[in-house]
C-alpha cells in the first residue's frame, strides 16, 4: 500500500492532539482530547502520565478513523511536546512512580535557591544556556528522588528511567524498547551541556541525579523505533521529534541563521535561529538548541512574553470590555491612534529583557478623551511592543538585523495586531497558510527522516505564506510610539528612560 501520509503527535499542556498531513503538507484530519490538570498545593502543577498516554493514543486512533486512513498508508510518526515536564517511571513495569511534574510547577524553588547559594548559577547559564529556575526539569527530578519513597534507591540501582514527555511517548509507542530524547528537549532539562552536546556530569553530581536514568540523545530527525497503532497493522517508524517551540521554528522553516518566528498564544514565544553559534545573551534571553536544515543541531535565542493572549482574556473576563477576542480588531480600528494610552500588562511581573518580578500592570497616559476603544487598542499594541523588546534584545545579542518575522498561534488571525507588529518592529511579518506550525514541524522531521520528503528545499514549496504585512509608518512615528511604551514600562519598573 502506498504511503501517502505522515502523522504528528502534538502533546500539549492541556490537551493531546494528532494531526495527519498529506504529501503536500495539507491537514487531512485532526483529533484532540483534553486531560486533567492536577493542583495538589498552591504553585504545584501535575499531570497523570498514564492519562497523557491514553489521551494521545486515543487521538491517534480517532484521527486515522476520521480520515479513513489505514495505518499501512502512514510513512512515519513524529512527536512534538510540552517541554520540561518531568516523568520518572519503573523500568521493569513501565509504571510512573509519581505524577508528571509540569513545567509551570514552582515546588522546586528551594532547590534552586540552594544551587544558587552553592555558586552554580553562572555555570548553569554558561553550559546549559538556561537560567536557574524551577521551570526546567533538573530540580523536578531531584524533588521526586528526594520525596517519593524508595525512588532514590531504585534510581541508584538502575531501576528507574527519566524522560520529558517526548521520551515517555516514544517509550510507550515502542512498548518499552526505546528510551531516547532529542537535543531540543534535552536542552530544556538544565542537565544538558549545549556546547558539548552531552549530559553534564558536574550538574548531575550537584543535583545527585544518577546518569543511568537519563535517555540517550538522538538527532531530532532520525528513526527511533517502530510502533503498531492499537497493536494492529504494519510497523510504522517513530521518527522525528522536537520540543514545541523548536518544532514551530522548524515548521516555519526558520532553518538558517537570522530567521525567527513568534508564537502568539497565552504568552508569546520568540525564537531566532543563530546557526552553528551558541549566542550568550546579555539581555536575559535563553540560549537553546534548534534544528538545522538537515536535522542537525543549530542554536537559537529564545525570549518569552508572559502576557500575550492572556491580556485579551483580561479585557474580556475581568473588565468586560469585549465579548470575544475577535472583537478587539473591530474596536481598535474605530480610533485612528492610541491617544497616548499605553497598557503595560505586568500582571505577573515582566519577563525578558526586564526580568522584574515585582512589576505590576498599569494603564498609562489616560486623558479625558480616552475611551474603551483606546484601551482595547493599547492591549493589542502591548503584545507587539513586548515582542519588539525581545527582537531588539536578540539583535543586540546576535548582531543580526531581522528582515522577516514568521508568526503563528491564535492571535495571528488579528490583522490589526499583525500590521502593528510590522509597523513597530520595521520588519515584514509573514503569516503562514497552515497555522498548525508546531505539528507541521514534527511532521516535517518525521517525513524527512524516512525519505517521505527529500529535503527542506522541497518543503519550502509546501509551507506557503498566506499574507505578508509590511511596515507602513514613518521611522519618526515608529520611534515616538516606542518611546511612549518605554516610558510607560519605566513607570512600573526600576528602569529609567530618557
UniProtKB/Swiss-Prot annotation:
Pathway: Polyol metabolism; glycerol degradation via glycerol kinase pathway; sn-glycerol 3-phosphate from glycerol: step 1/1. PROSITE patterns: FGGY_KINASES_1 (PS00933), FGGY_KINASES_2 (PS00445). ADP binds at residues 13, 17, 266, 309, 410, 414. SUPFAM superfamilies: Actin-like ATPase domain. Its EC number is 2.7.1.30. Keywords: ATP-binding, Glycerol metabolism, Kinase, Nucleotide-binding, Transferase. ATP binds at residues 13-15, 266, 309, 313, 410. One of its GO terms (cellular component) is cytosol. Glycerol binds at residues 83-84, 135, 244-245. GO terms for molecular function: ATP binding; glycerol kinase activity. The keyword Transferase applies. Sn-glycerol 3-phosphate binds at residues 13, 83-84, 135, 244. The keyword Transferase applies. GO terms for biological process: glycerol catabolic process; glycerol metabolic process; glycerol-3-phosphate metabolic process. Inhibited by fructose 1,6-bisphosphate (FBP). Coiled coil: none annotated. It catalyses: glycerol + ATP = sn-glycerol 3-phosphate + ADP + H(+). Belongs to the FGGY kinase family. Key enzyme in the regulation of glycerol uptake and metabolism. Catalyzes the phosphorylation of glycerol to yield sn-glycerol 3-phosphate. This is Glycerol kinase. It comes from Shewanella loihica (strain ATCC BAA-1088 / PV-4). The lineage of its organism: Bacteria, Pseudomonadati, Pseudomonadota, Gammaproteobacteria, Alteromonadales. The gene is glpK.
